């Protein structure tokens, strides 16, 4: 029996998540992973590397709870929010019996984590405005244990209607966990569902330090939920999910000074986003620019595959969304520095496109 034959059947047929780094490229303008464009500096203060770290570092948990406006017992820290997705599926879904549900176009790790665990994936296509199709979701709920909703949604950038989220939570009460993925919530903090935890025992909120906190390389995420859910997740998480240096830097990032710095970065990103959107809307090859509540912009572009390759050859790396449902011709552009945004605009202006009267 070959090594391939020894592997689980669902792993043999699995298509791995195509992360921005896995797709590669040799550019000098990286606008494909929704990262903060400049490095932030921290000095390590914890020097106890000879000892195992805390399973759930107290200082990190307490600071994040204070920042998010929840109780420490409602916080779990993990190796990025991606681990939170995996833990929820492992804790709540029986392989071969239960299902998860999500609404494409959306983040790809929901399906990868479910398929890796042998859990069925059900999809309900988002509406034309990339909102929830609630009647269609209601028809698919039998056997669903976890529902993933990304808000703001990646890659489209819009918020999910809060009244629709309430309807979904009522629809799923006693049937399924509803997970609100808030990886980008710092760019629109008024829209968080963290304050709803007291109303909905089956609500879970995912957060990360990868985006607005500019710590994508740290791999530190958070799951916010009621204590009953957190206790179940603690049963399936690895004993030491965060290394001592990661916990040290995370705690610094969540200090009052760290949060102030994060908010200053967000303000700069939002200003740069306005510049990028305005420039894109004046560019002939750009057919449509969609409103965004995040640190990235989705645009529909004439001959998008050729444009993507042209910019790639110029060292400008974007994220091609052509294979996502309803996103034919779309590229996702991370908001970089002001100079990087201008390079994108200038490069796109050199591409053939439509007359201004034909664009939307």
Curated annotation (Swiss-Prot):
Listed EC numbers: 2.6.1.9
Similarity annotation: Belongs to the class-II pyridoxal-phosphate-dependent aminotransferase family. Histidinol-phosphate aminotransferase subfamily.
Keywords associated with the record: Amino-acid biosynthesis, Aminotransferase, Histidine biosynthesis, Pyridoxal phosphate, Transferase
Quaternary organization: Homodimer.
GO MF entries: histidinol-phosphate transaminase activity; pyridoxal phosphate binding
Source domain of life: Bacteria
Keyword Cell division among record annotations: no
InterPro entries per UniProt: Aminotrans_II_pyridoxalP_BS, Aminotransferase_I/II_large, HisP_aminotrans, PyrdxlP-dep_Trfase, PyrdxlP-dep_Trfase_major, PyrdxlP-dep_Trfase_small
Class of the enzyme per the UniProt entry, highest EC level: transferase
Signal peptide stretch: none
Catalytic function, reaction form: L-histidinol phosphate + 2-oxoglutarate = 3-(imidazol-4-yl)-2-oxopropyl phosphate + L-glutamate
Protein name stated in the entry: Histidinol-phosphate aminotransferase
Record bears the keyword Protein biosynthesis: no
One GO BP annotation of this record: L-histidine biosynthetic process
Pfam families assigned to the protein according to its UniProt record, in alphabetical order: Aminotran_1_2
Cofactors demanded by this protein: pyridoxal 5'-phosphate
Pathway of action: Amino-acid biosynthesis; L-histidine biosynthesis; L-histidine from 5-phospho-alpha-D-ribose 1-diphosphate: step 7/9
Matching PROSITE patterns: AA_TRANSFER_CLASS_2
Residues found modified as N6-(pyridoxal phosphate)lysine: 211
């Amino acid at each position: 029996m070959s090594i391939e034959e020894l592997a689980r059947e669902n792993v043999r047929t699995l298509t791995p998540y195509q992360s921005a780094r896995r797709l590669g490229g040799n550019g000098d303008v990286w606008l494909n992973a929704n990262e903060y464009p400049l490095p932030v500096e921290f000095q390590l203060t914890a020097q106890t590397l000879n000892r195992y770290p805390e399973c759930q570092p107290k200082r990190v948990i307490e600071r994040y709870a204070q920042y998010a406006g929840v109780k420490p017992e409602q916080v779990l820290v993990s190796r990025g929010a991606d681990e939170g997705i995996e833990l929820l599926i492992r804790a709540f879904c029986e392989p071969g019996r239960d299902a998860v549900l999500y609404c494409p176009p959306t983040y790809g790790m929901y399906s990868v984590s479910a398929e890796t665990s042998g859990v069925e994936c059900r999809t309900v296509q988002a509406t034309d405005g990339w909102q929830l199709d609630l009647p269609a979701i209601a028809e698919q709920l039998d056997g669903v244990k976890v529902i993933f909703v990304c808000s703001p949604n990646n890659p489209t950038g819009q918020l999910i209607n809060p009244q629709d989220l309430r309807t979904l939570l009522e629809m799923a009460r006693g049937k399924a966990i509803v997970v609100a993925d808030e990886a980008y919530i710092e760019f629109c903090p008024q829209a968080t569902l963290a304050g709803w935890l007291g109303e909905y025992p089956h609500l879970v909120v995912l957060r990360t330090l990868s985006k607005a906190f500019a710590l994508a390389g740290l791999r530190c995420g958070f799951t916010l939920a009621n204590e009953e859910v957190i206790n179940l997740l603690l049963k399936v998480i690895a004993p030491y999910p965060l290394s001592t240096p990661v916990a040290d830097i995370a705690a610094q990032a969540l200090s009052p000074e760290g949060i102030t710095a994060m908010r200053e970065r967000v303000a700069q990103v939002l200003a740069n986003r306005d510049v990028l959107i305005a420039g894109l809307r004046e560019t002939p090859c750009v057919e449509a620019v969609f409103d965004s509540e995040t640190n990235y912009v989705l645009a529909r572009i004439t001959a998008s595959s050729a444009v993507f390759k042209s910019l790639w050859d110029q060292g400008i790396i974007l994220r091609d969304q052509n294979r996502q449902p309803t996103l034919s011709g779309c590229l996702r552009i991370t908001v970089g520095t002001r100079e990087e945004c201008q390079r994108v605009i200038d490069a796109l202006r050199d591409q053939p496109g439509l007359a201004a009267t034909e664009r939307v």
